[in-house]
Amino acid sequence: MSIILGIDPGSRITGYGVIRQVGRQLTYLGSGCIRTKVDDLPSRLKLIYAGVTEIITQFQPDYFAIEQVFMAKNADSALKLGQARGVAIVAAVNQELPVFEYAARQVKQTVVGIGSAEKSQVQHMVRTLLKLPANPQADAADALAIAITHCHVSQNVMQMSESRLNLARGRLR
């Protein structure tokens, strides 16, 4: 059993989603958004750090998965996003959580089956995969999708490692 915290970083709204994985079974534990209503960036970063730390304390995840930075058209926005990611990652590292990063395209490909999927498609598939009664908020859905992606990627890595181990054992005999 593993608990995964997914984070969709943003300097104004940071989505989070927490799921439990037992084998191939995924269970929704919680999700939401950290909203920073203050104007100055340092105060927003402090709120993101405090919010992520609180979520980690509440859910006690085993893994921390976050979206990678994409190249934005606006350099200022990309820098602010990078800083928001940074404080979220520091919150995880301070709690000694292993950090995994996934590209937005990989997340959409994993959850929807199309790397260029729309936000509404991600919301719908997250709702379906986690058997939720309604679509989660967009940022929370993205965070849940990141957590789901981590589950699928880690499951595939474990299967590949097991196959290689079995192959190596076969060669050693």
UniProtKB/Swiss-Prot annotation:
Its main location: cytoplasm. Keywords: Cytoplasm, DNA damage, DNA recombination, DNA repair, DNA-binding, Endonuclease, Hydrolase, Magnesium, Metal-binding, Nuclease. The active site is at residues 8, 67, 139. One of its GO terms (molecular function) is magnesium ion binding. It catalyses: Endonucleolytic cleavage at a junction such as a reciprocal single-stranded crossover between two homologous DNA duplexes (Holliday junction). Disulfide bonds: none annotated. GO terms for biological process: DNA recombination; DNA repair. One of its GO terms (cellular component) is cytoplasm. Pfam families: RuvC. InterPro entries: RNaseH-like_sf, RNaseH_sf, X-over_junc_endoDNase_Mg_BS, X-over_junc_endoDNase_RuvC. Its EC number is 3.1.21.10. Homodimer which binds Holliday junction (HJ) DNA. The HJ becomes 2-fold symmetrical on binding to RuvC with unstacked arms; it has a different conformation from HJ DNA in complex with RuvA. In the full resolvosome a probable DNA-RuvA(4)-RuvB(12)-RuvC(2) complex forms which resolves the HJ. Belongs to the RuvC family. This is Crossover junction endodeoxyribonuclease RuvC.
